[in-house]
Amino acid sequence: MIAHYSLILKPIHSPKNPELKQLRLLFEKARERKKKGLFVIEGEREIKKALLGKYNFTQLFIEEGSTPETPEVQALLNQTTAFQVEKNAFQRISRRSGSEKILAVAETKSHELEHLKLSDQALILVVEAPEKPGNIGA
């Protein structure tokens, strides 16, 4: 279980904890996410995808009694500020029901055109005002 991680996890017992209040703001307010340059990732699979995308993580929130299953996510416990959140408090901040017992806060990336890194033979598709944007890539 999470026993050997408890030394590096800061305990949170109340849903009124300032860290959880900030997390809730990031979940609910796009303006807050943009202002802080942060976003919330829920679930271990999504966190692993963000790791592959080389996102920088600032915080990790794990439900009390849970532990990350993958070594990559376990390694984040040593690289970020990590919290062990009491079950009731965690359920109040979590947006998904079920087995997702981990949340992360990561820094947003700039997706401006001037920051785009292209290979020498890149294929670029420009689409302006598509009628059904959901069909792009289908």
Where in the sequence are the language-model features?
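Solvent-exposed alpha-helices and their adjacent loops that cap or buttress functional pockets
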Residues: 31-33, 95-97, 116-120
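RNA substrate-binding interface of SAM-dependent RNA methyltransferases
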Residues: 52, 83, 110-138
